[in-house]
C-alpha cells in the first residue's frame, strides 16, 4: 500500500477514537452499561458510574 492510503485509513480511526473518549459519562452520573462510563465501571445495583 502507498503511504497516503495508510494515512487515509489511520486518520479517521484516530479521530473516532478521540471522539469516543470525550463522549464518556463522568463518575457519579447515570449509566446503563459499563462502556458508557469514563472509568469503565457502571453500578448494576444503582445505575451510576463508579470511580476506578
UniProtKB/Swiss-Prot annotation:
Recorded superkingdom: Viruses
Cleaved signal peptide residues: 1-18
Location relative to the cell: Secreted
Disulfide cross-links: 24-38, 31-42, 37-49
Pfam families the record matches: Toxin_18
InterPro entries xrefs: Toxin_18
Cellular component, GO annotation: extracellular region
Annotated keywords: Disulfide bond, Knottin, Secreted, Signal
Domain notes: The presence of a 'disulfide through disulfide knot' structurally defines this protein as a knottin.
Protein name from the UniProt record: Conotoxin-like peptide 2
Provenance organism: Orgyia pseudotsugata multicapsid polyhedrosis virus
